[in-house]
């Protein structure tokens, strides 16, 4: 599914003393099968943008098109799964099974939820028999995150949105979470990430969009992002290119991904 965000603006508490402009004339395209990072400081409008994309809130103005068409919230949510920053915010059930099965029962009430729940739990690395009867609220941070993701991919959507998925995870937990992202990408499906931990996620994304005070200030490849926002990367890139030339290799014939890998491994 290709998503087009066209001149989207959003104002919270419009017409009241608490009025706040969260987004201002934001336009972007999210291509099918790509992994997009949405970056920016706290309050820049990242979460608001993705909630609009996921059909959870209506923009004040502008359009969001899905494969060129406007769709209602319910239709959108069948094709998009969004996991929030804090898994507890989306938990409601007393058993992991019921938590994960909710979307199946909601969108496809005639289907047997058991095989789909088992598939989703195994996809995120949770053993079905060991976890299906456990209480979601009493799991570890990493386990809660996995349950939250399983519950939004169980109905097999085209797009997975993860809002700050690395928060509260140790190094091993972050690695495990990013493995889930990579597995989702191998299915040819779209991933949209919000993360402040750019250094950890940058090698897993194709493109970066940066928001600042509700406006889009950057939209480009991860290579372009690093060159613009990380002066250390530019210096490292020049050194690596010089070494390649001295070794008789041509850095200018390499793709951005090949050169980026050389720089990151230098």
Curated annotation (Swiss-Prot):
Entry membrane topology: Peripheral membrane protein
GO cellular component, one term: plasma membrane
Subcellular location: Cell inner membrane
GO BP: any one term: riboflavin transport
Top-level taxon: Bacteria
GO molecular function annotations of the record: ATP binding; ATP hydrolysis activity; ATPase-coupled transmembrane transporter activity; riboflavin transmembrane transporter activity
Residue numbers binding ATP: 43-48
One Pfam family named in its UniProt record: ABC_tran
Keyword Protein biosynthesis: no
InterPro entries in alphabetical order: AAA+_ATPase, ABC_transporter-like_ATP-bd, ABC_transporter-like_CS, ABC_transpr_CbiO/EcfA_su, ECF_ABC_transporter_ATP-bd, P-loop_NTPase
Keyword line: ATP-binding, Cell inner membrane, Cell membrane, Membrane, Nucleotide-binding, Translocase, Transport
Active-site residues, Swiss-Prot/TrEMBL: 164
Record family assignment: Belongs to the ABC transporter superfamily. Energy-coupling factor EcfA family.
Subunit description: Forms a heterodimer with EcfA1. Forms a stable energy-coupling factor (ECF) transporter complex composed of 2 membrane-embedded substrate-binding proteins (S component, RibU, BioY), 2 ATP-binding proteins (A component) and 2 transmembrane proteins (T component) upon coexpression in E.coli. Stable subcomplexes with both A plus T components can also be isolated. This complex interacts with at least 2 substrate-specific components, BioY and RibU.
Protein name (Swiss-Prot/TrEMBL): Energy-coupling factor transporter ATP-binding protein EcfA2
Name of the encoding gene: ecfA2
């Amino acid at each position: 599914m290709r998503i087009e965000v066209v001149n989207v603006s959003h104002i919270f508490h419009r017409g009241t003393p608490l009025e706040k402009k969260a987004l201002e004339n934001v336009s972007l395209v999210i291509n099918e099968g790509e992994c997009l990072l949405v970056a920016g400081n706290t309050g820049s409008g990242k979460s608001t943008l993705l909630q609009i994309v996921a059909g959870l809130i209506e923009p004040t103005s502008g359009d969001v098109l899905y494969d060129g068409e406007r769709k209602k919230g319910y239709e959108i949510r069948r094709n998009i799964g969004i996991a929030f920053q804090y898994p507890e915010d989306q938990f409601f059930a007393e058993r992991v099974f019921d938590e994960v099965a909710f979307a199946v029962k909601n969108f496809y009430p005639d289907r047997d939820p058991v095989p789909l729940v088992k598939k989703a739990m195994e996809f995120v690395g949770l053993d079905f028999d060991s976890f299906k009867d456990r209480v979601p609220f009493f799991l570890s941070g990493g386990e809660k995150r996995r349950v939250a993701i399983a519950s939004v991919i169980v109905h097999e959507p085209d797009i997975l949105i993860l809002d700050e998925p690395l928060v509260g995870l140790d190094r091993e937990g972050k690695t495990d979470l990013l493995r889930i992202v990579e597995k989702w990408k191998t299915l040819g499906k779209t991933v949209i990430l919000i993360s402040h931990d750019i250094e950890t996620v940058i090698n897993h994304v194709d493109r970066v969009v940066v928001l600042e005070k509700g406006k889009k200030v950057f939209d480009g490849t991860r290579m372009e992002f690093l060159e613009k926002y990380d002066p250390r990367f530019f210096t490292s890139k020049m050194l690596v290119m010089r070494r390649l030339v001295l070794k008789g290799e041509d850095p200018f014939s390499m793709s951005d991904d090949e050169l980026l890998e050389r720089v990151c491994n230098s």
